[in-house]
Amino acid sequence: MPGGRRGPSRQQLSRSALPSLQTLVGGGCGNGTGLRNRNGSAIGLPVPPITALITPGPVRHCQIPDLPVDGSLLFEFLFFIYLLVALFIQYINIYKTVWWYPYNHPASCTSLNFHLIDYHLAAFITVMLARRLVWALISEATKAGAASMIHYMVLISARLVLLTLCGWVLCWTLVNLFRSHSVLNLLFLGYPFGVYVPLCCFHQDSRAHLLLTDYNYVVQHEAVEESASTVGGLAKSKDFLSLLLESLKEQFNNATPIPTHSCPLSPDLIRNEVECLKADFNHRIKEVLFNSLFSAYYVAFLPLCFVKSTQYYDMRWSCEHLIMVWINAFVMLTTQLLPSKYCDLLHKSAAHLGKWQKLEHGSYSNAPQHIWSENTIWPQGVLVRHSRCLYRAMGPYNVAVPSDVSHARFYFLFHRPLRLLNLLILIEGSVVFYQLYSLLRSEKWNHTLSMALILFCNYYVLFKLLRDRIVLGRAYSYPLNSYELKAN
């Protein structure tokens, strides 16, 4: 009616008359603002925090069976045998002969040109490849303990003899290599250690190292701050020699024990657990990468550096063998250092951490939004603002920092417990199928022999991966109600 007062439209009614979810769950606790009228003034309503009205459901974990894992000594022995077989195959690829020719050719009397092989180099490579096995023997003997003084003296003597023998062989081979080769070739002998020290030992996370010494993770926030404040002094006190000795010692140490998951209740403790697990995972991956590259370097690349210029060999096949050795060593070390129990631990921690999805500005403008708080456990679907950006909670339990990329990466990698295992099966299965294809297409005797020997080693690794995948796949697909559920 002209001149009369118009009633409010539907849009105005929906915005002013109905309280928003932000008012119902955010309120005056820092998670949102109060109800506002059209003039923008806040109406003071006593509103409880979001955690009092929307409580996320408890995180429930599946119980997986204890799958058999090779012991440290057994794995190092099998890994050493595999590397010796790969080294033998590489020497066949380099020094093979046409031994079926008539005997009037001097080089065709044997299948290999044994007179061209540098046995000092082969002995040096063998000692370098056996370093982990030797240290595993010493560690297992030390763990066994001594029942008597005689037993203790025998253990000490055996350890001394073993280390002395390895050191003597190493020095003897180095002296002979110095006499018969140029300085440029000799630089290749210690190249992996020269690369490892500057890349790895100067980038150690001292705070993570301090926190990882105790694996119960249930620490007070004050202790965390105190340990973080002492990081600077500890990092500065380390000189180059101590870092060098520490980094070299890590190459002989066995894998660190698997930590335990404590289902912490506090968001700070959850994030602290994730930081510790992230540092431990990065350390294990660093060891896997270095040891796999170290093995491939000494097995397949170093023999090529000492080949005489007059010696002909198939460069493509030798480089292909180098890649295969590295991939197989990577899968074997990953399977040993990242077992199914450890991956399940990372999955449980990722379930507590949660994930945030970044949204565009202007989207969800009419939906309730909250200010992110580090002391709040956010349920799924909640919109929060953090660092001038809008995020939506994706997991059922969210305590991650929205702007922290490492938290999002951690959740992406481990919120599905079989992701890493499926990746290893895909890599190893592709290698096995390619080697079978190459075996069927091979026409040279050294190609057939090398593929046949390597395939036997790969079958064992693929069998273990498929066994774990079948068992864990059924365990994780089982209904949660059938387990004895563990909730926080």
UniProtKB/Swiss-Prot annotation:
Job of this protein: Regulates autophagy by controlling the spatial distribution and levels of the intracellular phosphatidylinositol 4-phosphate (PtdIns(4)P) pools. Modulates (PtdIns(4)P) levels by regulating the ER-to-Golgi trafficking of the phosphatidylinositide phosphatase SACM1L.
Alphabetized UniProt keyword annotations: Autophagy, Endoplasmic reticulum, Glycoprotein, Membrane, Transmembrane, Transmembrane helix
Residues annotated as transmembrane: 72-92, 110-130, 154-174, 182-202, 287-307, 319-339, 420-440, 446-466
Protein name: Transmembrane protein 39A
Quaternary organization: Interacts with SACM1L, SEC23A and SEC24A. (Microbial infection) Interacts with encephalomyocarditis virus (EMCV) major capsid proteins VP1 and VP2.
Subcellular location, record wording: Endoplasmic reticulum membrane
Tissue specificity field: Up-regulated in brain tumor glioblastoma multiforme cells (at protein level).
Topological category with respect to the lipid bilayer: Multi-pass membrane protein
Gene this chain is encoded by: TMEM39A
Biological processes, Gene Ontology terms: autophagy; negative regulation of autophagosome assembly; negative regulation of autophagosome maturation; positive regulation of viral genome replication
Family the UniProt entry places it in: Belongs to the TMEM39 family.
Glycan attachment sites: 31, 39
Cellular compartments per GO CC: endoplasmic reticulum membrane
Main location (coarse class): endoplasmic reticulum
